[in-house]
C-alpha cells in the first residue's frame, strides 16, 4: 500500500489518532511494537492559529516515530487551511482532516462528524487545505451522519476529486 510517496507493508498497522492518548511517548511506544504509521492527537485549527501552547505542543514529532500524520479539525476553510500551513512547518508526512469525531463539543459546533451534515462545506475545507499545503492530505470520516444519511459512497469520490491521497472510514454513523 502506498500513500503519496510513503510505501507501507502489504497489511499496514496504523495507530489511530486519539485525544489525550497519542502523545509523542505513546506514539514512540507503538512504533516500537510495530505501528507502521502514527497520528497525533487531533488538533483544533482555531487553537493552533491562536498559538495556544498546549495545542502547539501536539505538533512535536520525533524522527523515530515517522511516518507521522498531524490530524486537524475545524469548521471553516480559511482556519483549516491556515492551520494546515502551520502544521506543515512541523514536517509531518501527512496532514489528516478529521471529519469523523462525534463528540458533542466538536460535532455540535459543526466540525468533525458535524460536517457530515454539510457536505459542501466539508468539500470546501478539503479543497482549501489541499491547495494550501505541499504535504499529502488525507481524511478520516464516518459512513454518514446517521443511519438514514449514509453518504460515504458519493462522498469518497467527491473527496478524491478534492485531491486527497487517502481516506480512512470509521465504519459506523
Question: Each predicted region: which residue ranges?
Answer:
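Short, hinge-like loop/turn segments at secondary-structure boundaries
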Residues: 55-59, 113-115, 155-157
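Nucleotide-sugar donor-binding and catalytic loop/hinge architecture
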Residues: 6-8
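Alpha-helix initiation/capping motif
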Residues: 19, 115-118
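Alpha/beta enzyme core
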Residues: 32, 78-111, 119-173
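Glycine-rich, positively charged N-terminal anion/phosphate-binding segment
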Residues: 2-4, 18-93
Amino acid at each position: 500500500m502506498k500513500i503519496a510517496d510513503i510505501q507501507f507493508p502489504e497489511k499496514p498497522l496504523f495507530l489511530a489518532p486519539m485525544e489525550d492518548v497519542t502523545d509523542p511517548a505513546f506514539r514512540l511506544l507503538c512504533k516500537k511494537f510495530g505501528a507502521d504509521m502514527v497520528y497525533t492527537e487531533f488538533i483544533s485549527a482555531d487553537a493552533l492559529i491562536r498559538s495556544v501552547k498546549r495545542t502547539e505542543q501536539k505538533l512535536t514529532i520525533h524522527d523515530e516515530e515517522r511516518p507521522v500524520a498531524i490530524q486537524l479539525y475545524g469548521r471553516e476553510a480559511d482556519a483549516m487551511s491556515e492551520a494546515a500551513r502551520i502544521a506543515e512547518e512541523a514536517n509531518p508526512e501527512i496532514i489528516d482532516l478529521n471529519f469523523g469525531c462525534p463528540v458533542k463539543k466538536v460535532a455540535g459546533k459543526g466540525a468533525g462528524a458535524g460536517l457530515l451534515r454539510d457536505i459542501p462545506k466539508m468539500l470546501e475545507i478539503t479543497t482549501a487545505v489541499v491547495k494550501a499545503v505541499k504535504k499529502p492530505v488525507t481524511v478520516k470520516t464516518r459512513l454518514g451522519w446517521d443511519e438514514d444519511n449514509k453518504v460515504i459512497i458519493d462522498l469518497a469520490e467527491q473527496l478524491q476529486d478534492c485531491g486527497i491521497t487517502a481516506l480512512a472510514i470509521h465504519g459506523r454513523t
